[in-house]
A protein has these predicted regions:
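Formylglycine-dependent sulfatase
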Residues: 1-186
């Protein structure tokens, strides 16, 4: 099937995907094509997708930080390059990989397409423990939304400050999920 990344790659763009992946390599599919088969030169995903990934550790207030929970621990079978980090910092991990990807392509005068798919606002919500507040779904949602906004802000600041990108970059923002009962509405 045609993909935007594959089209751009064939037309000279460097392509990178950093974030959620739902196009093969799911929790129960160990033989899906790698993300590169969809047109991406570089990728870093979360629990799904073949290849390098950030896997989430979870903490609740009062939980022993030496014994965090693990979401989808068996996802390690889907590829090498697994790094574990707090769920509340996964988008930061994606942004911290996306910026060097852009820097490398800029240095080589290479046009690029960057796919950044954070999923912070997908339940269950795992903000930093200091941001749990009353623990209500609405509070947790707001906390993960604010954390995601901070990371997107870091990415946008990089684009704004870079002379080759400022005024020459198209940014599209879409949400991972629709309304979540109990999380509030805009």
């Amino acid at each position: 099937a045609p993909t935007l990344a594959r089209f751009l790659q064939k037309n000279g763009y460097a392509t990178g995907h950093f974030g959620k992946w739902h196009m093969g390599g799911q929790r129960n599919v160990a033989d899906a094509p790698p993300i590169s088969a969809y047109g991406f030169d570089q990728s870093l995903t979360n629990f799904e997708g073949m290849g390098p990934k950030l896997l989430p550790l979870t903490l609740k207030p009062g939980q022993n930080p030496e014994k965090p929970g693990r979401i989808w621990a068996d996802a390690t079978r889907l590829g090498n390059g697994v790094r574990w980090m707090q769920r509340s910092h996964i988008t930061e991990g994606f942004v911290n990989e996306a910026i060097p990807f852009m820097e490398k392509e800029i240095a080589g005068n290479q046009p690029f397409y960057l796919n950044l798919w954070p999923d912070d606002v997908h339940s269950p919500f795992w903000p930093p423990t200091v941001k749990w507040g009353d623990g209500s779904k609405r509070r947790l949602y707001l906390s993960v939304l604010e954390a995601m906004d901070q990371q997107l802000g870091k990415l946008f600041a990089f684009v704004r400050k870079h002379p080759k990108l400022s005024g020459n970059t198209l940014i599209m923002v879409c949400s991972d999920n629709g309304p979540e009962k109990g999380a509030g509405v805009a």
